A protein has these predicted regions:
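N-terminal leader/targeting and accessory segments in enzymes
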Residues: 1-41
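Phosphate-binding loop of NTP-binding sites
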Residues: 31, 37-164, 168
Length: 169
């Protein structure tokens, strides 16, 4: 934790140990049982206060390109940095969102079943885009059907009356 602060961090969420004395934590350190879930919850709270459309993008390939095209085309939009598209990167990006942005565009990657569900539940997109279902990521997902199932997890977390954009064929 001290290394993080010496490298410029201003706040830390750490895994609390049973024998940890909460009074000895620094004021800018939060000890929790599950740091990933705590980070996700903070991101959800931030996004609940955002009034613009939230766009979630996943797929075997084309995620970053699609994100970049949308970001270039939507004035004053926010998008995930580079490909910070996992359970740590996406919530961190959400916490950097300026509530004055016109739209928020999030890229979501997956290495295993449940990854897209976890990420899309954080952002609860108004628009969900699946760019492509292909043979990439087969190592963790076993088959093309596995890739389809994982990428389709996005659909279940699109807001009511939201829009899903999926490939044809």
């Amino acid at each position: 934790c001290d290394d993080a602060f010496s490298n410029g961090a201003v706040f830390a969420i750490i895994k609390a140990k049973k024998d940890m004395n909460a009074n000895k934590l620094k004021d800018n350190t939060l000890g929790v049982s599950n740091p990933e879930k705590a980070l996700a919850k903070l991101a959800q709270v931030t996004l609940k206060n955002f009034t613009g459309p939230v766009i979630g993008i996943t797929g075997s390939n084309g995620k970053t390109t699609t994100k970049n095209i949308l970001s270039a085309g939507i004035k004053n939009s926010f998008s995930t940095f580079k490909n910070f598209n996992n359970e740590i990167g996406l919530p961190l990006c959400a916490l950097m969102l300026d509530l004055k942005n016109e739209a928020a565009i999030f890229e979501m990657g997956a290495a295993k079943k449940g990854d897209i569900h976890f990420l899309s539940k954080i952002i609860q997109p108004d628009i969900g885009i699946i760019t492509h279902i292909g043979h990439s990521h087969l190592l963790g997902l076993n088959s093309l059907k596995g890739v389809l199932e994982v990428k389709s997890e996005l659909i279940h977390n699109i807001k009511n009356n939201g829009t899903a954009i999926v490939p044809n064929g």
